[in-house]
Amino acid sequence: MASNRQRSLRGPSHPSHMEEPFLQMVQASESLPPSQTWAQREFFLPSESWEFPGFTRQAYHQLALKLPPCTDMKSKVRQRLIHPWKGGAQHTWGFHTWLDVCRLPATFPTQPDRPYDSNVWRWLTDSNAHRCPPTEHPIPPPSWMGQNSFLTFIHCYPTFVDMKRKKQVIFRTVKELKEVEKLKLRSEARAPPLDAQGNIQPPASFKKYRHISAGGRFEPQGLQLMPNPFPNNFARSWPCPNPLPHYQEKVLKLALLPSAPLSQDLIRDFQTLIKDRTALPLHHLSKAQASKSPARKRKRRPGHF
């Protein structure tokens, strides 16, 4: 009896046959792979490469997935985006002539030229332009739309079948025209249109802005802009020799800078050009009124002055 009690207290030296399956299950659960989500179990992982059966990917198929090589131009563009370019390109001397001519009224022949003389604008800078050969690419004659605008075309021609759609297009066009008038008024404040004598055509409500100094402050007797001299044929591509800030700089890009007056030589050549031609303004003056927003009256709180 004593020997049987000692055996029962010590326990069996080896596990019984009933406990072996339980131990195997515990050991198997320890070696199981980590738990996966439902998407990982049901769908293919994008990182794993797999191919359709019966199809072997060739080397040229990788060209569609391979990015194009980085060229020198692309690397320069990326560097400019990261580090902005400090030095800006200088405009040429002849660039001012192009700007000044664009401010003058457009000239139209009294009788249509056949063929159209494309050298007419060269007379402003070259007195012997009529002897020069015509331009390599023929310039079409100028067109004058007048009142024949897109809005008139919508009203006169039965373009739209749906009247509701037609009203929407007319409303959008009128809205765009009003916005154009506002932008035109801002442009006229900075660079007003000129007549054939080079004088400003001020509207009834035109306001002359004071000059702005280099620091961006208003000064009544500030920097006076001088007209740009006429370059000859050899100096048109040279950098502009005028050291004064006569052109819009980055610092004063949004400032109300007045335009430089025109050169007297350019006005004299233009008046000679329009003797047998009709001078019409580039565009009609803006009919938009400057917005006069009343100043907000601040209410004083009791105890504050």
UniProtKB/Swiss-Prot annotation:
Residues 284-305 are annotated as: Disordered. Residues 294-305 have a biased composition (Basic residues). Expressed in Testis. This is Testis-expressed protein 52. It comes from Homo sapiens (Human).
